[in-house]
Design a protein with these regions (language model features):
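Metal-ion/cofactor- or nucleotide/acyl-coenzyme-handling active-site neighborhoods
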Residues: 317-515
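Catalytic cores and adjacent flexible loops of soluble metabolic enzymes
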Residues: 1-321
Length: 515
C-alpha cells in the first residue's frame, strides 16, 4: 500500500529514528510477494526519504555458491550508492556463510554502500565461534555487526555476554536484533546498551514473523528519559492504530505459549508459525511436534522435518494385530468430530441401536452416548497423551499404532483393549498390509479407512464429517483421502448419512432408512 509506506516514512522520520529498513532485496520470485520483498530502486523512487537512511536486507543463503555471487550482486544492485535510494545494506548470514558474506561485502562496498552484517542463530554460537567470526570480519570497515537471536531464546545476561565478545574483538558498532518468543525482546534490547550496542532494531507493535520483535513504541518510551530527548510519539501511535493493529490481527504475530516453548528448546519460530496457520494442527499435535523438534536441532526451518514431527512415531512401520480378527462386522458407522452431529444425536442413537451397527469414533470426542461406541481411533500419539479420559474407554477398542508409540504413552494404555496396527506415511499412497498400513498424511480419517480396508467390511457410513464451507481449500486434503480410498477399495461402499461439504463423498439421509 503506497499510502501506508509513504505515511510510514514520514512518521519514522518525525520520531528522530536514524534508519528505516524497508524490506528485502531478493531475486527469488517463485510466488506472489509484495514490493517490499524486492524493494527495487524504481519502487523506492516513489517516496521522499530525505533526512532518513534507507536500508534493505539481503539473505546470503540466496547465493548457493561463490561463483554466482558477483552476478547476483550486480543484478540485485545495478546502481551504485550515488544513484540509488538505498543507503545501507544488511547482509544476513549464518556462521557457515561467513566466507560468502565477505565476498558480497567487498562487491557492495565497491559500489559505495554502507554495510552491516547480521549474524543469525546467536543462541547456538559459543564464545569461541563468536571470536572466530569477529576475527574473520574485523578487517572489513563495517558500519555495524549485529547478533540476531533467531530463536528468541536468550536472556539479557547471555545476549550481552555474546555481544560483548563482538565489541571486544572488533571496532565495529554493535547491533541487536531481538525476537520476542520469551517476551524479553525489549529487555534484551535496552540491556544491550550497557555493553555498547548502538544499533537497536525495533518494529511497530513488534511486527515480525511469528513471535515478533522489539516493540518500537515501547523502546522509544523507554529511551526518552535516558537520552533526555523529547520525542513526540503520538503520530507513531496513531499510525500504528490506523494500519498495524489490523495487520497484527490478520497475521497474528506476537508471543504465545507455543513460541515460548520454541524458545526454550531453541526451535526456529517458523515451525510454530506454520503450524498455527494450518488448521490441521490441533493443540496436542503442536505440542507433540515441539516435543519431537526439540531433540532434532531445529534451528532452521524445514517443511519435511515438520511433516516428520507431525507423525512423531518411532521406528519402522509395524504392528502386532490383524484388523479383521478384531473388527468382524460388515457394516461400520464412522463418527467424525464436527459439532453438526449434535443436530442428529437422537436420530443417530436410535439408528445405531436399531441397525446394531459397529461404531468407530475419531479420537475421544463424544457427541453420542459412550455405550454405543465400540472403538476409537488415535493416529497421533499426542492425541493419546493429551486425553485424560482414556480410563473411561476401557470397554472400547483403541485402534492405534501401539508398537510404534513412545513408552510413556504405551503405559497409559496398559489397561485398554488395543488393536495394534502400524502406519507409514507416504504421499499419495493408501494401502492396507497385514499388520500396518500406508497412508498419505497422519490424519485419523486416513488411518481409520486404511485399517478398515484390512477387514471384511462392505459398507462404511459417515456421520459428523461436515467439512469446511464450500470452496475452502482445507477440504482438499480430506477429499484426496476419500479419492485414494475409493480407488484402492472399490468393493467397499462409503457414504455420509449426515450433511457434508466434501464433494466426492456420496450421501444418503439418515431419515431415509427404514426404522
Amino acid at each position: 500500500d503506497i499510502e501506508l509506506i509513504r505515511e510510514h516514512i514520514d512518521v519514522i522520520r518525525s520520531c528522530n529514528i536514524d534508519i528505516l529498513e524497508l524490506g528485502f532485496r531478493s531475486l527469488i520470485n517463485d510466488q506472489y510477494k509484495g514490493p517490499l520483498a524486492f524493494t527495487r530502486d524504481d519502487f523506492l523512487e516513489k517516496f521522499d526519504s530525505k533526512n532518513l537512511k534507507i536500508a534493505v536486507m539481503v539473505n546470503i543463503k540466496e547465493f548457493e555458491n561463490h561463483n554466482e555471487i558477483k552476478n547476483k550482486i550486480n543484478r540485485l544492485f545495478p546502481f551504485d550508492s550515488n544513484n540509488s535510494k538505498v543507503d545501507i545494506i544488511r547482509l544476513a548470514c549464518t556462521y557457515e556463510e561467513i566466507d560468502k558474506v565477505k565476498v558480497a561485502y567487498q562487491l557492495l562496498k565497491e559500489k559505495g554502500f554502507e554495510i552491516c552484517i547480521n549474524i543469525m542463530h546467536g543462541a547456538f554460537l559459543d564464545f569461541k565461534t563468536l571470536k572466530d567470526i569477529a576475527n574473520s570480519l574485523k578487517k572489513l570497515p563495517l558500519s555495524a555487526i549485529y547478533l540476531a537471536d533467531s530463536t528468541g531464546s536468550m536472556d539479557s545476561i547471555e545476549y550481552n555476554s555474546k555481544l560483548k565478545i563482538l565489541a571486544q574483538e572488533t571496532n565495529f558498532d554493535i547491533g541487536i536484533h531481538a525476537h520476542n518468543n520469551l517476551g524479553k525482546a525489549l529487555d534484551n534490547t535496552l540491556s544491550s546498551i550497557s555493553i555498547g550496542s548502538s544499533w537497536l532494531d525495533a518494529t511497530i507493535l513488534g511486527m515480525g514473523r511469528g513471535p515478533g520483535n522489539t516493540d518500537i513504541e515501547e523502546l522509544l518510551i523507554s529511551l526518552t528519559p535516558k537520552y533526555r530527548k523529547k520525542i513526540n510519539i503520538i503520530p507513531l501511535i496513531n499510525h500504528s492504530k490506523k494500519w498495524f493493529e489490523k495487520l497484527k490481527e490478520e497475521h497474528k504475530w506476537g508471543k504465545n505459549r507455543f513460541y515460548f516453548l520454541s524458545a526454550k528448546y531453541k526451535i526456529h519460530p517458523s515451525f510454530i508459525q506454520t503450524m498455527l496457520t494450518d488448521s490441521r494442527y490441533s493443540t496436542a499435535e503442536i505440542i507433540g511436534a515441539i516435543d519431537y523438534l526439540k531433540n532434532d536441532k531445529s534451528r532452521t526451518f524445514n517443511s519435511q522435518k515438520l511433516l516428520k514431527a507431525r507423525t512423531f512415531f518411532e521406528g519402522k512401520p509395524r504392528g502386532q494385530d490383524i484388523p479383521k480378527h478384531k473388527i468382524k462386522q460388515e457394516r461400520v458407522l464412522l463418527l467424525g468430530n464436527s459439532e453438526g452431529i449434535l443436530n442428529f444425536k437422537d436420530k443417530l442413537e436410535e439408528f445405531i441401536t436399531y441397525e446394531n451397527l459397529y461404531v468407530i469414533g475419531i479420537n475421544s470426542k463424544s457427541y453420542i452416548s459412550q455405550e454405543l461406541i465400540d472403538a476409537r481411533v488415535f493416529a497421533h500419539p499426542m492425541r493419546l497423551l493429551a486425553d485424560n479420559n482414556l480410563f473411561e474407554l476401557l470397554n472400547q477398542l483403541i485402534i492405534t499404532p501401539y508398537s510404534m508409540l513412545p513408552e510413556k504413552i504405551k503405559l497409559k494404555l496398559k489397561n485398554n483393549n488395543v488393536l495394534d496396527y502400524g502406519l507409514e506415511i507416504e504421499r499419495g499412497s493408501m494401502e492396507s498390509l497385514k499388520n500396518y498400513c500406508t497412508i498419505p498424511s497422519p490424519i485419523a480419517l486416513a488411518y481409520t479407512l486404511a485399517t478398515l480396508g484390512a477387514t471384511n467390511v462392505k459398507n462404511i457410513m459417515l456421520a459428523g464429517f461436515d467439512g469446511y464451507p464450500k470452496g475452502d481449500i482445507r477440504n482438499q486434503e480430506v477429499e484426496n483421502i476419500f479419492d485414494l480410498f475409493r480407488k484402492k477399495y472399490e468393493k467397499i461402499n462409503i457414504y455420509s448419512i449426515t450433511p457434508t461439504n466434501y464433494f466426492n463423498v456420496s450421501s444418503k439421509s439418515i431419515y431415509g432408512f427404514n426404522l
